[in-house]
């Protein structure tokens, strides 16, 4: 990277942007935000970007649409100010709707991708994106980095009893395996079934996979926790089969509608997330993973 690097602190991710700038030893540029009475956002970039490589850090957690539009405003303005732009979206909203699951559904991620393509971004970086297919809608160079090793190192230092990494479903088995490799243990995936229309989650407590969890400390690992339905159900089942302790780890702790209290009430000993989404459980910093990818651009 020949250009001078600067980091723009998006309104949704100021602390994370500060951490990124420290690791890169880069100039930190503040972004002013004004919200009008009707909900519109106005963005003002307080710095000179001409000829610089600008890393814009802005997650799109709730309010999703406001944070998404603010990100697009920053990318567009930074480009017009003469910067080469890397849109860093630690939590990328709309990645779940990456195809038409039911007839008539809008493919939200397709439009989100096209908006960043046309806004002026040269690169896009996400962290543990919900769907790899989501990245295919970016026509610019898009990279997804994993926070799993950072989460795993947190738990590796906790001196757990015969730890076992557990994915709440088969779709996350690769994530659990990655986590287990860092911790130095094994992993399993729970046989979860979700009704596409009602969203109801079911896990068979008599499934043979669960035998491996008896008497051990288990770490439920997922990419995101929204309302926590899957994690709550998984925690209840793991407690029922006789685990020693149940810990919950996720990259994106959205924790909506009282999810954290519900998870703890289900029997979890601790919930740990990263700072892609600021929360009371955001104990792991993803800045090192982001900076590692930036250094490769």
Give residue ranges: language-model regions:
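PRPP-associated nucleotide enzymes
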Residues: 1-297
């Amino acid at each position: 990277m020949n250009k001078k690097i600067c980091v723009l602190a998006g309104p949704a991710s100021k602390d994370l942007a500060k951490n990124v700038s420290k690791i890169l030893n880069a100039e930190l540029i503040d972004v002013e935000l004004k919200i009008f009475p009707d909900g519109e956002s106005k963005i003002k970039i307080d710095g000179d970007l001409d000829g610089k490589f600008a890393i814009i850090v802005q997650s799109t957690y709730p309010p999703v649409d406001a944070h998404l539009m603010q990100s697009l405003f920053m990318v567009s303005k930074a480009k017009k100010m003469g910067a080469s732009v890397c849109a860093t979206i630690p939590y990328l909203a709309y990645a779940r709707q990456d195809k038409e699951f039911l007839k008539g559904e809008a493919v939200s991620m397709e439009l989100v991708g096209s908006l960043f393509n046309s806004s002026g971004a040269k690169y896009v970086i996400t962290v543990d994106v919900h769907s790899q297919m989501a990245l295919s809608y970016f026509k610019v160079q898009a990279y997804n980095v994993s926070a799993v090793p950072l989460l795993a190192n947190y738990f590796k230092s906790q001196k757990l009893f015969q730890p076992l990494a557990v994915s709440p479903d088969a779709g996350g088995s690769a994530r659990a395996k990655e986590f287990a490799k860092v911790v130095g243990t094994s992993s399993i995936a729970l046989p979860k079934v979700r009704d596409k229309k009602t969203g109801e989650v079911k896990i068979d407590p008599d499934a043979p996979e669960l035998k491996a969890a008896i008497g051990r400390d288990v770490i439920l690992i997922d990419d995101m926790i929204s309302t926590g339905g899957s994690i709550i159900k998984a925690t209840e089942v793991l407690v029922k089969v006789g685990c020693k302790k149940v810990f919950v780890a996720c990259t994106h702790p959205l924790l909506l509608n009282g999810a954290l209290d519900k998870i703890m009430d289900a029997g979890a000993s601790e919930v740990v997330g990263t700072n892609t989404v600021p929360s009371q459980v955001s104990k792991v910093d993803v800045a090192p993973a982001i900076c590692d990818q930036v250094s490769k651009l």
